[in-house]
């Protein structure tokens, strides 16, 4: 018998960030403290199947691997009663994108009555939706880029003024970003400056979501910080992204080891700006009711040095070049200890939830 905590490391999934998820899971699997935890990888294939234990371990070293006959998740109980795995004590989801970080998987864990790393259901759903994040950040006094949201029914109406580049430019300026509201890692994002580009960008973004944001372009430098904890979160230092391509931080820039973008940690910025980035991050983390972890991304606007929120990533990557673990390593929390803390915070929140009343006696 072992008294180690059994961790279900869930990764993969039917998402545009599928391979990123596998790379993150590989790193967590390699770095987790095996004196404290027994790890059981759980690979959800691109087709939505849950592979067995052997294949789930193999794919960690080969993200492009496919299986012919994976074990299908036929019902909820299969998650915790698979024949080749013991019952899991705590889940560590690293399924990026749709279903994995939008509250769906988190809701399943709540139904299973199991602790899990990362946001609870509400915060996961809110932070996945860029518009909802903006609304809550504004209420907390954190600056955000001006935006217009275009819903699917509006996009399908050829007479809707939001489809007119000239109208949108009159509200937000001619230099714009078009992005799916519920996607991460710059997937489906386009930079546009004219009518033709705008039409193409809308079509591209609507491939990924039923709501698209059109935002003013904030010229400056992308800065990021990381948050760890529940009621008394720790805010790391600030990192800065230097993009040699002189363009926005693309999906490839974020996850390609050969990317020409570099991460500067700590950022060489005035102390006042660093503290503003950190204070804003804490405000947003609490306003969106995050718990466990989040990476807060902002732009340092060049014209006035205002820190403008761009995104809350409540399930950040753990790849070789991911900013989240690097920021905590810089302040003295190494990768292995960070993983342990995340699991501890998951257990802490679960234990607290158990003290809440759910019915009136």
From Swiss-Prot:
Its main location: cytoplasm. One of its GO terms (molecular function) is D-alanine-D-alanine ligase activity. Mg(2+) 1 binds at residues 297, 311. Pfam families: Dala_Dala_lig_C, Dala_Dala_lig_N. Its EC number is 6.3.2.4. Residues 134-344 form the ATP-grasp domain. Keywords: ATP-binding, Cell shape, Cell wall biogenesis/degradation, Cytoplasm, Ligase, Magnesium, Manganese, Metal-binding, Nucleotide-binding, Peptidoglycan synthesis. GO terms for biological process: cell wall organization; peptidoglycan biosynthetic process; regulation of cell shape. Pathway: Cell wall biogenesis; peptidoglycan biosynthesis. HAMAP family: Dala_Dala_lig. The keyword Cell wall biogenesis/degradation applies. This is D-alanine--D-alanine ligase. Mg(2+) 2 binds at residues 311, 313. It comes from Lactobacillus johnsonii (strain CNCM I-12250 / La1 / NCC 533). It catalyses: 2 D-alanine + ATP = D-alanyl-D-alanine + ADP + phosphate + H(+). The keyword Cell wall biogenesis/degradation applies. Cell wall formation. It is found in: Cytoplasm. It comes from the Bacteria. One of its GO terms (cellular component) is cytosol. Binds 2 magnesium or manganese ions per subunit. Belongs to the D-alanine--D-alanine ligase family.
